[in-house]
Amino acid sequence: MYKTMIQRIQSIYLFVVTILSVTICFYPYASLGDRELTYSSSPIYYGLSTIIPVVTFAAIFFFRKRILQMRLCSFSIILMLFQAIYMIASFFIASEGCKEGLCHLYLPVVVPFINMILTYLAVRGIAKDEAMVRAADRLR
């Protein structure tokens, strides 16, 4: 049962998204001179960084319910978009009093965009599976 789940490329995409979402929690996403914006610096960022890996990891196990899996992935993409917007907006708001050259964005800011692309690829793979199952049902 689980062997067929792991062989699906969209399951691998979703697993990579889960891993990336968890790893960005351990690194600061911006430097503001003497302080850094991190995972625990805001309850909104904390909440999004907790919900996204849980939703994407849960979506892996709904491989038999492809429509629900696509909905979970779409919901996850929306959350990732909010996370990326929040990270960038909080940096620009917090960096207003920062001196030139002392404020920097780090690599974790790019991760939500990578996650969105991988999740979109997973949705496409799930849709292909659903189309293949429906075509097989028509032949029966």
Model regions: which residues?
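Cytosolic juxtamembrane helix and N-cap/initiation of the first transmembrane helix
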Residues: M1-T23
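Interfacial segments of alpha-helical transmembrane regions
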Residues: Q7-F15, Q69-S76, P112
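Individual transmembrane alpha-helices with interfacial aromatic-anchor signatures
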Residues: Q7-Q10, G101-L121
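Membrane-embedded alpha-helical transmembrane segments of multi-pass integral membrane proteins
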Residues: V17-Y27, I51-A58, L79-Y86, V111-L121
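The feature represents the first ordered module of a protein
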Residues: L32-F92
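Non-cytosolic membrane-interface motifs at loop->transmembrane helix junctions
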Residues: E36-P43, C98-V109
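Extended, acidic-biased charged interface segments
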Residues: F91-A94, M116-K128
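Cytosolic juxtamembrane helix at the C-terminal end of the final transmembrane segment
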Residues: A122-R140
